[in-house]
Curated annotation (Swiss-Prot):
Listed name of the protein: Glucose-signaling factor 2
Residue intervals passing through the bilayer: 178-198
Glycosylation sites: N89, N173
Coiled-coil segments on the chain, per record: 330-388
Top-level taxon of origin: Eukaryota
InterPro entries, alphabetized: Gsf2
Record gene name: GSF2
Main function: May be involved in the secretion of hexose transporters from the endoplasmic reticulum. Involved in secretion of GAL2 and HXT1.
Natural source organism: Saccharomyces cerevisiae (strain ATCC 204508 / S288c) (Baker's yeast)
Cytoplasmic face of the membrane: 199-403
More details: Present with 21400 molecules/cell in log phase SD medium.
GO cellular component: cytoplasm; endoplasmic reticulum; endoplasmic reticulum membrane; mitochondrial outer membrane
GO biological process, one term: protein folding
Its membrane topology: Single-pass type II membrane protein
GO molecular function terms listed in the Swiss-Prot or TrEMBL record: unfolded protein binding
Length: 403
């Protein structure tokens, strides 16, 4: 079974992982995050440097999600909101807790150690740039330290004017009081920008240790791995073997916006251009594909009914889209039919599988297409009824005012 795990607490980093019937949080998912045996030293997993490297808890998203035009499920942007999360049992098999394709959301704890270290470094840096007029140790800023290193170099290269200029600049109170305060304010602003980038995870390095980053090159190099393993080094594990043992697939689930853009371009190309698509009446659906599911549908379907419920019956009798084993078998059959059309072309088949994992199916068979059509009709009926109720309420209020 394939599931998705949200890394970096980022909606754009929902990665697919393969799990077996016996896999649990303890014996599978938690192994993804340690430094030496997992992926923490190979790629950034945590939201920012201010978080611990390993999550403290794991949740599943029970937001119903979106039903795509191909009959697949996409994650909603509110999938990781607190009200849409349910904690997973660490020792219970994942297959008994999750639907195929469901989203697992790790909970990350702030690292007090990292926060304190960063704060001390930034405060020390700010201290060195205090205006000379108020600093207990004027003239110790990093710029002055660099200038002091360049003075003997300038003298050695017989550049007395430059050396003299540098010697003047390193003197305390060389700049005017206004300039000193202006530079200090700019320095505070610079520290604020750096902190913002790190907090938001825009800058989120694996490590600040250059040696550690350099040593990772050996692990990510297939030739280096082969050489070290053949030499009997048990501390170095082949990267592909490690990824395979963790269930890593390497595919990311698309956000709804990515899906919408990709599906729109697909429809336009298929129709032979925007004009042809407009004439065929396909533009409206391509511009806003899919249907947002409601409570009790999608990933909120009762998991205990997985092997007894019928998705295609419930859409007609209960007027809602529920998940079932029948539905996932139909998805698998659809994908197999699509792959058969490539006549054994491995490249095209792999590309289609990657697209399926990222965007779902684009050309469903009649059974899946009918399912989506019925669910869209239900959504349209609800929207029409809601609009009628709103119109009736407005007219009722107008009648009261006239009386």
């Amino acid at each position: 079974m394939e599931i998705y795990i949200r890394l970096n607490a980022d909606v754009e980093h929902d990665y697919a992982f393969q799990v077996s019937n016996e896999d649990t949080i303890n014996n599978k998912i938690k192994k993804i995050f340690p430094s030496k045996t997992g992926l923490a030293d190979l790629m950034v997993l945590r939201p920012s440097i201010f978080h611990e490297k390993e999550p403290v808890k794991f949740y599943k998203s029970i937001h119903p999600g979106y039903l795509s035009e191909g009959g697949c499920l996409m994650f909603h942007y509110e999938a990781d909101n607190e009200e849409n999360l349910e904690e997973l049992n660490d020792s219970k098999p994942l297959i008994d807790q999750l639907w195929p394709g469901q989203l697992v959301v790790p909970e990350w704890k702030l690292s007090k150690k990292n926060i304190w270290v960063y704060t001390i470094i930034m405060l020390a840096w700010l201290y060195t740039d205090l205006p000379d007029a108020i600093s207990p140790t004027p003239g110790i800023c990093l710029t002055n330290q660099l200038s002091r290193l360049l003075i003997p170099v300038a003298k050695h290269m017989d550049l007395p004017e430059i050396a003299a200029k540098l010697e003047q600049e390193v003197q305390a109170n060389y700049s005017s009081l206004v300039a000193q305060w202006l530079f200090f304010v700019m320095h505070i602003f610079k520290v604020g920008i750096i902190t913002l980038f790190l907090k938001l995870g825009i800058a989120n390095p694996i490590s600040f240790n250059p040696y550690k980053l350099w040593s990772l090159r050996d692990l990510t190099s297939p030739s280096a791995n082969g050489a070290k393993n053949s030499g009997g080094n048990n501390n170095t594990t082949d990267l592909k073997t490690r990824l395979r043992s963790l269930g890593w697939i390497g595919a990311k689930r698309a956000t709804y916006d990515d899906y919408q853009t990709n599906y729109y371009n697909y429809v336009i190309d298929k129709m032979g251009g925007a004009v042809a698509a407009y004439r065929a009446g396909a533009i409206r659906k391509a511009a806003a594909p899919g249907i947002q599911l409601v409570a009790g549908e999608g990933f909120q379907s009762p998991l205990e009914d997985r092997f007894t419920a019928s998705t295609f019956t419930a859409i007609k009798t209960e007027r809602k889209f529920i998940l079932s084993e029948e539905y996932f078998v139909e998805l698998e059959n659809n994908l197999k039919k699509i792959l058969e059309e490539y006549d054994g072309d491995i490249g095209k088949m792999n590309a289609e599988i990657r697209r399926f994992r990222r965007f779902g199916i684009y050309e469903p068979d009649e059974k899946l297409a009918s399912l989506v059509k019925l669910r869209r009709e239900i959504a349209d009926e609800k929207e029409k009824a809601s609009n009628n109720d709103a119109t009736f309420g407005i007219k009722k209020n107008d009648l009261k005012k006239s009386n």
